[in-house]
Amino acid sequence: MLRDFLFLYPIMQLKILKWLLQFFRSVNRKSKFISDKLKKEIYFYELEERDSDIYIVTFPKSGTTWMQLIVYHLLTDGNMDFKHIYDVSPWLSNQAFRGASPEAVNKLPSPRFFKSHDKYEQFNRGFNNKVIYVYREGKDVAASYFHHNKNY
């Protein structure tokens, strides 16, 4: 019943999440994991989704950045007017953990496209946005993860 109430009134859900974040920050340092999760949830609730949004959702080390560049080239006819791909295609979870405001992302021109390693269901809130899911063989992901962590 509470879940139905929160679903119907998202502004209440946002206020509850902000209160919980403040509560867990004041308890102790061991609650950092919980406060980080809440910070991310608040960021996603404050993000204004559009019908033209494109989400590139993958498991880590599965070619996410390559897919970002491919989508950018298709949308801009090969224009390379950016310093880093995150300038034109932000990584939403990374932005949330850094404490960045979603205002900059909300000001990006349509169609916007985002990188994420989260579940794609988190972004689909009844809009007609698009999701690109990149699948890569599990053995290749494990090998790539191993070499990434070894050299990190």
Language-model-derived ranges and their functions:
Residues 2-152:
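PAPS-dependent sulfotransferase catalytic domain
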